[in-house]
From Swiss-Prot:
Reactions catalysed: uridine(54) in tRNA + (6R)-5,10-methylene-5,6,7,8-tetrahydrofolate + NADH + H(+) = 5-methyluridine(54) in tRNA + (6S)-5,6,7,8-tetrahydrofolate + NAD(+); uridine(54) in tRNA + (6R)-5,10-methylene-5,6,7,8-tetrahydrofolate + NADPH + H(+) = 5-methyluridine(54) in tRNA + (6S)-5,6,7,8-tetrahydrofolate + NADP(+)
Enzyme class name: transferase
Principal cellular location given in the protein's record: cytoplasm
UniProt KW keywords: Cytoplasm, FAD, Flavoprotein, Methyltransferase, NAD, NADP, Transferase, tRNA processing
Localisation per UniProt entry: Cytoplasm
Stored NCBIfam families: gid_trmFO, PRK05335.1
Quaternary data: Homodimer.
Family from the record: Belongs to the MnmG family. TrmFO subfamily.
Gene Ontology MF: a single term: flavin adenine dinucleotide binding
Listed name of the protein: Methylenetetrahydrofolate--tRNA-(uracil-5-)-methyltransferase TrmFO
EC number: 2.1.1.74
Species: Bacillus subtilis (strain 168)
Length: 435
């Protein structure tokens, strides 16, 4: 093909990564971002790759599949992971970032590339020519209508909920202790211990609190990885005690005693003045949020700088619509990337943008497109979302279960995952030399 310009719609994690991968390969990019001309219900700035949920990109170790995915992306010169490494804040074995510095870094990196032209306007029709659609879970109504017409499929709806962010200075540090679970990495989390009585009182308040009403035509489907805390609470006390409030590995550093339940807070900014409440994504009404959070030991006088909010997430039925190259099956010059493909998570979204960007570049250069092998975390995600059961398709995080099985079965989980990680990184390093 002679066309040397690619349209990228959306400058979130996936779109920014796709634009970067295209630009560094000499391709001219028209990057469309409707913010700040038109905002979404969850975004607050005009920056690229704004994080609207947690500030954590999850595990940074090779013992976890998402850690392997990050390492693969580093080998492929990911703009998102480079910015995250640059803007990291203490988070034990995880990679968490100062969300404002991170978004600014990605914006500067992508916007200042000579091959990238940024156009701040809403795209209401899918353009002709090579295009990557990375408009995310909050795709505008106009473009959603176009996509529905294009795909011939009904959208699937579910909700992501963002956790509240609080001021550290408002916490009672006499009741809170610093520790990471099982003492992994540096002590990076503030822990609020609860007795059984305190937990029961908190659980009762949480289950009786009022939530923001949903529109009648919207169907509630919660993805397990970002379930609102009040929905979790209604499933039963044990759901919380085995979930975000589990006390295992968080024994008090002075007494050595294990609390009945623990609420963890994670640093949210580089200065260490703001903390988010881990796993407490919510769509409670704001007044109720504050009253419920005040029942957590140490948060009696909490100052909330950003209340938890809930927003719709939208994703397409990728198994019926996409190839492992992230190409649309019925139009070879159209690609999709990000959460709307059914990959779930910041890193997974960026990784899909990386693959779509590389393959869109290959397409316009007349080269063979890349299908990353299932031995890699990147390839296993692409394989999963394009080959799994169409009827029950749900979003998926990176995990070792998606990777191609090892030639020899290893019973020990730690050793098995180590083998998965080593094989994935060796494979991606070989591939990186050819693309």
């Amino acid at each position: 093909m002679n066309q040397q310009t690619v349209n990228v719609i959306g400058a979130g994690l996936a779109g920014s990564e796709a634009a970067w991968q295209l630009a560094k390969r000499g391709i001219q990019v028209k990057l469309y971002e409707m913010r700040p001309v038109k905002q979404t219900p969850a975004h607050h700035t005009d920056k690229f790759a704004e994080l609207v949920c947690s500030n954590s990109l999850r595990s940074n170790t090779l013992a976890n599949a998402v850690g392997v995915l990050k390492e693969e992306m580093r080998a492929l010169d990911s703009a998102i992971i480079a910015a995250a490494d640059e803007c990291s804040v203490p988070a034990g074995g995880a990679l968490a970032v100062d969300r404002h510095e991170f978004a600014a870094s990605v914006t500067n990196r992508v916007k200042n590339h000579p091959n990238v032209t940024v156009i701040n306007e809403e795209v209401t029709e899918i353009p002709e020519g090579p295009t990557i659609i990375a408009t995310g879970p909050l795709t505008s109504e106009s473009l959603s209508a176009q996509l529905k017409e294009l795909t011939g499929e009904d959208y699937l709806y579910f909700y992501d909920a963002a956790a509240p962010i609080v001021e550290k200075d408002s916490l009672d540090m006499d009741k809170v202790y610093l520790k990471s679970r099982y003492d992994k990495g540096e002590a990076a989390y503030l822990n609020c211990p609860m007795t059984e009585e305190e937990f029961d009182r908190f659980h009762e308040a949480l289950t009786s609190a009022e939530t923001v009403p949903l529109k009648e035509f919207e169907k509630e489907i919660f993805f397990e990885g970002c379930m609102p805390i009040e929905v979790m609470a209604k499933r039963g006390k044990k759901t919380m005690l085995f979930g975000p409030m589990k006390p295992v590995g968080l024994e008090h550093p002075v007494t050595g005693k294990r609390p009945y339940a623990v609420v963890q807070l994670r640093q949210d900014d580089a200065a260490g003045t703001l903390y988010n409440i881990v796993g407490f994504q919510t769509h409670l009404k704001w007044g109720d949020q504050k009253e419920v959070l005040k029942l957590i030991p140490g948060l009696e006088n909490v100052e909330i700088v950003r209340y938890g909010v809930m927003h719709r997430n939208t994703f397409i039925n990728s198994p019926s619509l996409l190839k492992p190259t992230y190409q649309f099956k019925n139009r070879s010059d159209l690609f999709f990337a990000g959460q709307m493909t059914g990959v779930e998570g910041y890193v997974e979204s960026a990784a899909s943008g990386l693959v779509a960007g590389i393959n869109a570049a290959k397409l316009v250069l007349g080269e063979e497109l890349v299908i990353f092998p299932q031995e890699t975390a990147i390839g296993s995600m692409a394989h999963y979302i394009t080959t799994t059961n169409q009827k029950n398709f749900q979003p998926m995080n990176a995990n070792f279960g998606l990777l191609k099985e090892l030639p020899v079965k290893i019973k020990n989980k730690k050793e098995r995952n180590e083998q998965y990680a080593n094989r994935a990184i060796e494979t991606i390093q070989t591939i990186s030399k050819t693309i």
